[in-house]
Amino acid sequence: MNPQLLRVTNRIIERSRETRSAYLARIEQAKTSTVHRSQLACGNLAHGFAACQPEDKASLKSMLRNNIAIITSYNDMLSAHQPYEHYPEIIRKALHEANAVGQVAGGVPAMCDGVTQGQDGMELSLLSREVIAMSAAVGLSHNMFDGALFLGVCDKIVPGLTMAALSFGHLPAVFVPSGPMASGLPNKEKVRIRQLYAEGKVDRMALLESEAASYHAPGTCTFYGTANTNQMVVEFMGMQLPGSSFVHPDSPLRDALTAAATRQVTRMTGNGNEWMPIGKMIDEKVVVNGIVALLATGGSTNHTMHLVAMARAAGIQINWDDFSDLSDVVPLMARLYPNGPADINHFQAAGGVPVLVRELLKAGLLHEDVNTVAGFGLSRYTLEPWLNNGELDWREGAEKSLDSNVIASFEQPFSHHGGTKVLSGNLGRAVMKTSAVPVENQVIEAPAVVFESQHDVMPAFEAGLLDRDCVVVVRHQGPKANGMPELHKLMPPLGVLLDRCFKIALVTDGRLSGASGKVPSAIHVTPEAYDGGLLAKVRDGDIIRVNGQTGELTLLVDEAELAAREPHIPDLSASRVGTGRELFSALREKLSGAEQGATCITF
């Protein structure tokens, strides 16, 4: 094993000793020796199966057969979640064949960040993770269930569902993906059209046609953003079946994998032969494997918050130092858009998860001795699923990458440093997705141009006010200020400035997700401006140094001068009402800092 990996793992274990012990005691107390519904009074139970078919009622009355909860995030708004419409039918059929019963225990909201990007609704995006966790918990709280299947793919949905699953950590749980849409317009062409539109060289209809050719069918968007990073990370964590993340929707193999996940969760219950509750399965080693997956693939920066919150739900304490120290030894081994031109379908064709797991296990950069939904040992995830005469089977995946432009070997990685860098200095701590930023653009020292809203940046760009070397500061975008929206609308104009050979960087307490692109961006700055961060004292013209190689984020202003300045606190009332934002005020005020997971839930 890599010594650094062991050091980080051991310090997480030590740091989490008390909280993890308390968590395990809690789930042990919740465990029962029989099916969970046996604890209900007759009236409770009758309500619970009132709408079931007669055969299912008989099974539930018997107290012998498993009842599996289905927590679904189906809606028609998310292309990745639309396929879930028919999953309950597939699941119930597979459960009946396994002498078990399934009920849709609840649905959770699922927001498409692609739809809300740059809109008021984006200010609910991060908060929706907490609502998803609580909504799933409401469904499971009926206490009718012996295991659960979680149907979710996209940005906040998988982290929220994981937090809920771990709150019911005494139950086994399997996550069931839907898979990516087929590849559409090449990513390089999509970016070209966006930048032309930002420069006023193509009209809105040309932009719309380009976007519609990129996002065109049911399934996950194919770029390597938060949704596909979710799938990568949870497969490395053993939370869904080997090789199941990136199989297309509406294919015989996808349906076979859904049925197999269903059968597997019945084996993992107290009535089965492989009892493995999710709260015991997800331990410190599993969390480290998830971080390694993120770093090795240059995944979404959102996971520097999501993984923290997910781990806390299991009583495990991680921080950005853990990400940083692992990033020093985990190489970047995948090049997917925005880190390169390839999409997630190219990744799958190049060998996918099995190749990466095999390479990282050989390098001693993953813990093999972990429990997964497929059984003990992460080496199971070097297998790939296939249909053998119409029946699902697993075989060894590719021994090495089938396309070295998409998946590199450990010996010849795209970079010897993981795709995420933690920055620190007097401005606080921040995260930079270095995997998408050319080395020559990772270091900048330039005057600040300060904005209080992302919507003010485009007019400044159009007026030529940014045609110079500068550090664009967009502040009061943190969790407590306005819910920490993603700021993707900034990328096309800032990308144009880079192409004009200006030295440009972005510094913000907001988010950018996995599609942060080529602009060097110090994001998730914590403490945020609204909550006492020095970012609130930055003025136009102040020199800021951003160094993605050494991990520096420094405001080069004399300490005495900074002490004399008053923080600038703008009127944020416009972010408090409209589009339902007033309903989230209590949650927003309780959100922790980005490094603490940006969560309002106390675990």
Please tell me what each predicted stretch does.
Residues 129-136, 143-148, 458-466, 473:
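Contiguous domain-boundary segments centered on the initiation and propagation of an alpha-helix
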Residues 86:
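Acidic/charged coordination and interface sites in well-structured regions
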Residues 1-66, 72-76, 80, 89-108, ...:
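Catalytic or ion-coupling anion/metal-binding cores of large enzyme and transporter domains
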Residues 139-161, 174-176:
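A short, small-residue-rich loop immediately preceding and capping a beta-strand
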Residues 105-143:
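N-terminal small/polar loop signature for handling phosphorylated ligands or for N-terminal nucleophile
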